[in-house]
């Protein structure tokens, strides 16, 4: 085989290997047995980070964002692209279906 043939085959193989693949988001289905602890409900949560004592809702209620989760209620059968947390039902509702939950009241 000639050098150009080997080079061409390698170039085509490397191009095919470098082609981007379809990105599929990781999602968890929330089921009826997601939370096996009584009085705990499933929430789809993303952790929030920030300095302790950061201003909270409307800058009136101080919220420690380092110990809070931003969550939405997990509806059975829905998909959660973040992480599903089982939390006690004492949450702060921001009025737009986004909830602030104390992370100490949640289990993984």
UniProtKB/Swiss-Prot annotation:
Pfam families: Eas (PF22354). Changing residue 98 to A: Does not significantly affect self-assembly and rodlet formation. Residues 1-26 form the signal peptide. Induction: Expression is controlled by blue light and by a circadian clock. A positive activating clock element (ACE) is found to reside in a 45-bp region, just upstream from the TATA box. Expression is regulated both developmentally and by light and is abundant in illuminated mycelia and conidiophores but is not detectable or is barely detectable in dark-grown mycelia, mature macroconidia, microconidia, and ascospores. Changing residue 73 to G: Increases self-assembly and rodlet formation. InterPro entries: Hydrophobin, Hydrophobin_CS, Hydrophobin_sf. It is found in: Secreted; Spore wall. Changing residue 76 to A: Does not significantly affect self-assembly and rodlet formation. The keyword Metal-binding does not apply. It comes from the Eukaryota. Keywords: Cell wall biogenesis/degradation, Conidiation, Disulfide bond, Secreted, Signal, Sporulation. One of its GO terms (cellular component) is fungal-type cell wall. Changing residue 75 to G: Increases self-assembly and rodlet formation. GO terms for biological process: cell wall organization. Disulfide bonds join 35-86, 44-80, 45-71, 87-106. The keyword Cell wall biogenesis/degradation applies. CDD domains: hydrophobin_I_eas-like. One of its GO terms (molecular function) is structural constituent of cell wall. Changing residue 102 to G: Decreases self-assembly and rodlet formation. Belongs to the fungal hydrophobin family. the Cys3-Cys4 loop (residies Cys-45 to Cys-71) does not have an integral role in the formation or structure of the rodlets and that the major determinant of the unique properties of these proteins is the amphipathic core structure. Aerial growth, conidiation, and dispersal of filamentous fungi in the environment rely upon a capability of their secreting small amphipathic proteins called hydrophobins (HPBs) with low sequence identity. Class I can self-assemble into an outermost layer of rodlet bundles on aerial cell surfaces, conferring cellular hydrophobicity that supports fungal growth, development and dispersal; whereas class II form highly ordered films at water-air interfaces through intermolecular interactions but contribute nothing to the rodlet structure. This is Class I hydrophobin eas. It comes from Neurospora crassa (strain ATCC 24698 / 74-OR23-1A / CBS 708.71 / DSM 1257 / FGSC 987).
């Amino acid at each position: 085989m000639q050098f150009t043939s080997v080079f061409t085959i390698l170039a085509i193989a490397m191009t095919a290997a470098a082609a981007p693949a379809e990105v599929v988001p990781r999602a968890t289905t929330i089921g009826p047995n997601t939370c096996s602890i009584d009085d705990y409900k499933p929430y789809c949560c993303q952790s929030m980070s920030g300095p302790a004592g950061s201003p909270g809702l409307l800058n009136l209620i101080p919220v420690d964002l380092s110990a809070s989760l931003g969550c939405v209620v997990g509806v059975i059968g829905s998909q959660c692209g973040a992480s599903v947390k089982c939390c006690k039902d004492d949450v702060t509702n921001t009025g737009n279906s986004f909830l602030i939950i104390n992370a100490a009241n949640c289990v993984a």
